[in-house]
Regions:
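Assembly/oligomerization scaffold segments
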Residues: 1-130
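An acidic/polar, Gly/Ser/Thr-rich interaction patch typically located in mid-to-C-terminal regions
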Residues: 34, 40-62, 73, 233-431
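Glycine-rich, acidic and aromatic/proline-enriched surface loops and short helix-turn segments
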Residues: 110-130, 142-163
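Short beta-strand-centered interaction patches in the first periplasmic/extracellular domains
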Residues: 118, 125-127, 163-255, 260
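Subunit-assembly interface segments of extracellular/virion macromolecular structures
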Residues: 132-137, 153, 188, 376, ...
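Second-shell loop/turn segments in exported
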Residues: 133-143, 170-176
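Sec-exported extracytoplasmic/periplasmic mature domains
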Residues: 154-159, 189-194, 381
Length: 431
């Protein structure tokens, strides 16, 4: 264990919109917070900047010497280009130094006088701006696999970033209807089914490595993945146990199965009433947690068990018009009309359940800064059990595999941490 050390700012540079000037702000950033989330299509970075008036040489007409501050030189008035390279104590880097990576999204001025001012800025992915342009809206009709439609959306943004996508089983059709490209991606994810798994639901998000379009279930599949392991041993011990990558400095469980909320959202059992406009018939279908457990990839061995009183009882009723006949698939035939793989309504309801199940158990942990981690990664956490035994062992309930839903790298001039919001759908260590 190397001990806690600050993140090294290899590059923090902001560029003027008015000329070719740029300012290196590495020496004036007391706080930097870098964030990713599996629920966000773009990255955000919040920086506090101490502007001491030394950003650039002053260009006085009378030839007098001196310097001026960041706000006087660059002004930070709009969507300035921003470049960033970060490195942690292990040599892991986040490199967002291309011209097309980042833009200043928001500026707030905290305090100011003639000698010093404090500025708080939010930097976002350039695509957050590109997504708002009318010229980039989705206007055509799109037919194909979900991952192909997501590719089309990113082409509309003209992004140069990579896409890491799971192939979808079902062909779907969407009309553009002037959707924002990110809006199209978020709509498509709800009705996509991965190849080989009968469980709907994808996520679309950005990390420092690029864009991701992943199946919820395949995200929890451990096959072929490098999974970092962290252990909580208490503040008294600074040692990391053999076989672990780091120490959990702090943990807090935010929600351990909010069952009432799950009932209200129909996560365990939903009744779907489908009206077929072609034959004027009403069909009733039940989507329950048994189907979820049978078809889904879970993080642990033990899924929540309901009492006999409420088991297999529906808690949410949805009335929908069956989408039969509403899609023209030139590669399919008439027999495809009643194929459940093409039933967008049922698929969207199933994904609705899957999202709520996968995020049902949530906790926060803090570790030493580790820039190799990204939103969507799996980590293994070992927590001590609560007991009065002579020797404390790992908790068989709380320990196990979790997915990083949200990530924040936090750095000051003296120390740095990574905060992780972790989620999963079940308990225990999977055998």
């Amino acid at each position: 264990m190397l001990g806690n050390k600050p993140i090294i700012y290899r590059k923090l540079e902001v560029f003027s919109n008015e000329n070719n000037d740029s300012v290196d702000i590495r020496g004036g950033v007391p706080v930097l917070e870098y964030r990713e989330s599996v629920l966000s299509p773009y990255i955000t970075i919040d920086l506090s900047i101490i502007d001491a008036g030394t950003a650039l040489p002053a260009k006085e007409k009378d030839g007098s010497r001196g310097t001026i501050g960041l706000l006087e030189s660059i002004k930070l008035q709009a969507d300035e280009k921003f470049k960033m390279i970060l490195e942690d104590q292990y040599g892991n880097k986040i490199d967002l130094s291309k011209d097309t990576d980042l833009k200043v999204g928001k500026t707030a001025f905290a305090t100011s006088n003639n000698r010093q001012s404090t500025v708080v800025i939010r930097v976002v992915s350039k695509e957050a701006y590109d997504n708002t342009l009318l010229e980039n809206r989705m206007v055509n009709s799109y037919l194909g696999k979900g991952d192909i439609i997501v590719e089309e959306a990113l082409k509309s943004l003209k992004t140069e970033k990579d896409l890491f996508a799971d192939t979808t089983e079902n062909d779907i059709q969407f009309n553009g209807d002037k959707r924002y490209p990110f809006e199209m991606c978020l709509d498509v994810q709800k009705v996509s089914i991965p190849v080989g798994i009968k469980s709907a639901g994808f996520l679309f998000w950005e990390t420092s490595k690029g864009y991701n379009y992943r199946s919820l279930d395949k995200m929890f599949d451990q096959t072929g993945k490098t999974i970092k392991k962290f252990v909580e041993t208490g503040f008294a011990s600074q040692k990391v146990l053999p076989g672990y990558n780091g120490k959990i400095l702090k943990s807090s469980f935010l929600r351990i199965n909010d069952t009432l909320k799950q009932f209200e959202d129909g996560a365990y059992n939903t009744e779907l009433d489908l009206f077929n406009p072609l034959n004027q018939k009403l069909a009733f279908q039940t989507l329950d947690s048994f189907d979820y457990n049978k078809n889904s990839t879970t993080a642990g061995d033990d899924t929540p068990v309901l009492s006999n009183e409420y088991r297999n009882k529906a808690t949410l009723s949805l009335d929908r018009i069956k989408d039969v006949g509403q899609k023209i698939n030139p590669r399919g035939g008439l027999a495809d009309i009643d194929d459940t793989k093409f039933d967008i309504v049922k698929t969207s309801v199933q994904s609705h359940q899957n999202y709520r199940q996968k995020f049902s158990i949530s906790l926060n942990i803090v570790i030493d800064a580790d820039l190799s981690l990204s939103a969507g990664d799996l980590v293994f956490c070992k927590f001590p059990e609560t007991s009065q035994k002579p020797s404390v062992t790992g908790s068989t309930k709380d320990s196990g595999i979790y997915m990083i839903a949200d990530l924040c790298h936090y750095s000051t001039p003296t120390q740095a941490f990574t905060g992780l919001n972790l989620v999963r759908d079940s308990y225990g260590v999977k055998s």
